[in-house]
Amino acid sequence: AEVEARPGETIWRVAQRRGIEIPHLCYSPEPGYRADGNCRACMVEIEGERVLAASCIRKPTNGMRVNTLSDRAVSARRGVFELLLADQPDREQAHEYDSTFWSWAGKLDLTNSRFPAGGAPAPDPSHPAMRVFLDACIHCNLCVRACREVQVNDVIGMAYRGHQAKIVFDFDDPMGESTCVACGECVQACPTGALMEATRVDADGVDKREPLDNVDSVCPYCGVGCQITYRTRHNRIVVVEGRNGPANEKRLCVKGRFGFDYVNHPHRLSEPLIRREDAPKDASTEIDPANPYTHFRTATWDEALDFAAAGLRRIRDRDGGRALAGFGSAKGSNEEAYLVQKLVRTGFGTNNVDHCTRLCHASSVAALLEGIGSGAVTAPFMACKDAEVIMVIGANPIENHPVAATYFKQAAQRGAKLIVIDPRGTALKRYASHMLVFRPGTDVALLNALINVIIREELYDSAYIERFTEGFENLRKRIAPFTPEAMAPICGVDAETLTAVARAYATSAASIVFWGMGISQHVHGTDNARCLIALATITGQVGRPGTGLHPLRGQNNVQGASDAGLIPMVYPDYQAVGDENVRAKFEDAWGTPLDPNAGLTVVEIMDAANAGKIKGMYVMGENPAMSDPDLQHARAALAKLEHLVVQDLFLTETAVHADVVLPASAWPEKDGTVTNTNRQVQMGRQALIVPGEARQDWWIIQEIAKRMGLKWQYTHPRDVYREMASVMPSLDNISWERLDAESSVTYPCDGPDEAGHEIVFGDGFPTASGRARLVPTEVLPPD
């Protein structure tokens, strides 16, 4: 048959696309893996050529005639597999019974080898999550490429010579004692079972061969939003595998692959609890989470929900809605966040609702809304693939966003300039072209110096400024004193380095900036973000491939929870509560009058609780007794509350002070959507059943709402999502059904069958003027 090859395709790829199977061992078709051509399992015969060709690396040419099933090709493949089979453990004793190797051996009708077996290396059980069985290793080097080229961790290598050659970790250390970060990429790549998850083999290293159920979902940890597949048995997660999602391309980190033991932890709450009458609250109270019955008693769901709602109603009816407050969670779903804020606004009668974004990127969102009219990123972190300069400031992605960091490291390896700016000198400095270690709290001085150089040396984009910004002349005037020479003694970075970095960022064809909570968790966090907005917009480094502004979101649904309205001064999609037209729209949608006044923030709520102004709280999935600034202050505030309802997985430090504790569902136990740092709305799916009497979070919220007098009738998270989509323009053309089919859609999206816009603001900004607002900043001493 005559076939056409696409540009850059190999013979193997063309054959795969045509449904023709060619064996492969050292080659992985997954994203990020280059072909090596060293195993010779994929040999094909090309007419007119004397020797066989490795189809994984050979590219077709016009008129080439390829025979994938010639006698020579098939014989060569069988020979390769028979040689490798000689050193493999017997299949019944295989570490992975259905590995790529054994699957292909079966298709080639090979079960044993005529060749003598070599010595079997001892297994390495030193790692808590993985096992190493070099008796199954075929030296395909996939694990080396996985570690060095995909994850860019540089732990695995090939050492020694001849028959002594083998895969090693660092300097031939046991895996568990090496610098391995346990991302598990090598395990996922290994075609033979030489590297295995510890949960899949027995004490002798033999595959348990348990039938596993597969459920596709999304990782519940950081804001990257990796797509995953849970592989479960008997209501336990046995293995987690990476899926080819838009944010991870099958990559995972240690948490995403191995961090799910908490779901079946013995301390999980499995029945509602009500505080005992003989256990008064105290700020210093500590309770053993394994034995909450010293301070709580068990209750039925009806009793617990009635008790929870009665206390909240009592305070609302006696003192008014503003005596109540609610905290939602950035670790739950969009639907749960939406329901929490709706409950507080319509059931409590107040806008006193917030979540942990207040303590992380609220300053970034404030500056972004002010400057460019949107609180979300302008480009995904994948945009670094097209960038010539990548600036990372106030973030430690190798530890906090490990999968995103793999793309930064890869970009640096291919030649992009990586500028890392941080007082600590993070792990990313190893890959940096410029590492600026500055004095803590002097962010504005440093960033203003960069802007000063760009304006003074006229490195800015005049056409872009004229068309898409406002306030440039004021910025030019206000930035004049902030020369690198004047700022160097303040920030601790020499003027020459500041100048070089400014020039590199401004003059590259594509520069992108990423920032984290290192610059947002400041009294001048908003000013820090204003500086970055000015830096990007005056140089025209927004709205094109490889450019943009990207605050790296911390938790898995900080973006989505904020979008869903879990913020005291805005309704869903950042629509101001003080705007009469906006408020009228939500009053019509929700069927009740709404408070026209902005609510209190997390910090203000805790202050008000300490002062006795906030008397009751509902806390769903948050732990302010551990996450708020000044823990003694936070715990004292919680202990003073007349009525505290906590909904969580464990008896947290906050739940210790609760009047009623409601056992909730973990992420693998629920359906729902989340929105990652890239603006990708993604579908999470239930893989496990909740333990004991625990319940789905959306159900618990609705049951409280009903007891607060609301007539909610949701039957599934999809009902909640559809209501959200009706009041949130950002979800236009992103239906629940589409998400269920596609798993991920980026907003904004122009049509039900169109891909969302990954890169935005190429033709202006969603501000009243259509322009970015440049806001000058001043150097302020740290508080």
Say what each PLM segment does.
Residues 232, 241, 252, 545, ...:
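Non-catalytic terminal/interface segments that mediate subunit docking, oligomerization
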Residues 279, 359-545, 552-731:
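Non-catalytic alpha/beta scaffold blocks inside enzyme catalytic domains
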Residues 153, 164, 214-216, 225-227, ...:
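Active-site lining segments that contact anionic ligands and/or coordinate catalytic metals
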Residues 36-42, 338-345, 527:
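Glycine-rich loop at the start of a catalytic domain that most often binds anionic cofactors/ligands
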Residues 3-62:
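N-terminal cofactor/phosphate-binding cores enriched in small/glycine residues
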Residues 559-567, 585, 717-783:
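Long, low-complexity segments enriched in small/aliphatic residues
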Residues 1-10, 46-48, 56, 63-459, ...:
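N-terminal export/assembly segments and adjacent metallocofactor-ligating motifs
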Residues 37-42, 222-226, 759-761:
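A short, compositionally biased
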